[in-house]
């Protein structure tokens, strides 16, 4: 009788174990997803839902003509190779913080509260692979600063200071 009970339980146990494994794998994949960037530093952690700008056309358009940006949203500019980018705010209607990121995911510079419509160049400095644009003032509010770390699957995970899990 006990053998029968154990035999009947095996499929249920296996199904439960498989379901738990699927949930665990899904959760692990959700940790690092192309539509999010995670940032961390001594101040804590933050996550932003991002649109990706990884072509010349998308990078040129950026966040121009947007009347608002959700508090936890941004745009992630991704370059094919490290570069020395320069941004401006022409046709940009909202103030933005620009977070410049090196190939390891380390933040090298934060330009706070870029002024809407200002055509003054905003240099990112050398060795920039990504730039995260978020609402103006958000970096200061959260504590995002030079030395903070960004996690995203498009970084080379072997070089990343905070690799995807």
Describe each PLM feature range.
Residues 2-17:
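Bacterial N-terminal signal peptides that target proteins for export
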Residues 15-25:
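Bacterial N-terminal signal peptides
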Residues 31-165:
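Compact, glycine-rich, soluble single-domain proteins
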